[in-house]
């Protein structure tokens, strides 16, 4: 540990004198402990602390405030801007807060933010055969995922993970510990479900659960080739089927464009017979070159396979990369001519990557059953998310940044003046704060600033795209 300072002494005391639970920049292994997710945005927090419980989180926050140091929490550490380890700020690593219990009367789970999604899936499955909608990557932390949205395979059927959060325990900027729900500290509860890192640190979640599906069918259909017209045809059919309303709500339905293929994949929560009766591939004019269908009766096995597939795709691990997101609704669907321009762009523009993927992830369904003003997550009318991702073997170049920035421009060229939201779970730290906040929070931004002003007027919980208090 570095030479004693008031901040260092206080931080060490906050964790009961456990020197292994704090780290400072002069330590030889500090960059390893920071563990950046995006290698192109290396950061140096003023210190890292690993508290054991809520009281230690609160004590660490007080140390930072007393030394005029800002704070960000970190659970799984998958933030695309490394915001959980912001330079010059205290990184509160929540890895030790992994408690879990299940009330088998209400089927409500109590969980700590340090739990990873893989552990959440396994514990819920083994304690009553339960689950909640969430993303497929098992290494993602609950603390961030449950407070930005939490979309995943079951979201069209059940909604977002944050929609299942019933109550939270939060450490505020004044180091007080409060609980929030729909009936208590309602404004804070609104903000936590979509923008928690700007208002406090969630140390405990109460999450209602659903029974696991009896049968889960995974499917993938692959069209090989690079012809822009053929690729646009697959995309437009995918978009039309989603927009037309005939797609079963209990179906996850994603389309991924890579350099050489179009991959339609997802899950159907029901029997394989019912899935085959829907005959998804028959809706496309050209039959896919490859088809894979598999049925799982063990929901954890299904979830583990989905996580392994995401990992194998190479888009969910620490690396050099750049990524962007866009939200499309029924009013901003991509028109035919713009779709062909998108795939011409992909075919002809230098990308500078060793891997890129453009994912169109279907939403709608139960996500729309919650109003845009009920939680900080604004994009309830979304038909689908677009996630673009470019990975490089070394330092990111302007070529890759310009490739993905240009792709977003082409994707929105059909209605360039329309509002296109963005997903705060996939931050783009290269854009301006104003553009980012408008994209993430839409018309909820002003209310969020009011709440920020009330609970954190001095902007203790801060990163480069956090919500500022009203000036």
From Swiss-Prot:
Pfam families: BBE, FAD_binding_4. The keyword Ribonucleoprotein does not apply. Pathway: Secondary metabolite biosynthesis. InterPro entries: BBE (IPR012951), FAD-bd_PCMH (IPR016166), FAD-bd_PCMH-like_sf (IPR036318), FAD-bd_PCMH_sub2 (IPR016169), FAD-linked_Oxidoreductase (IPR050416), Oxid_FAD_bind_N (IPR006094). Its EC number is 1.1.1.-. One of its GO terms (molecular function) is oxidoreductase activity. Residues 41-212 form the FAD-binding PCMH-type domain. The keyword Cell membrane does not apply. It is an enzyme of class 1 (oxidoreductase). Belongs to the oxygen-dependent FAD-linked oxidoreductase family. FAD-linked oxidoreductase; part of the gene cluster that mediates the biosynthesis of sorbicillinoids, a diverse group of yellow secondary metabolites that restrict growth of competing pathogenic fungi but not of bacteria. Sorbicillinoids biosynthesis requires the action of two PKSs. SorA iteratively combines three acetyl units and the growing chain is modified by the ketoacyl reductase subunit, and optional by the enoyl reductase subunit in the second cycle. The polyketide is then handed over to the PKS SorB, which adds three more acetyl units, and two methyl groups. This is FAD-linked oxidoreductase sorD.
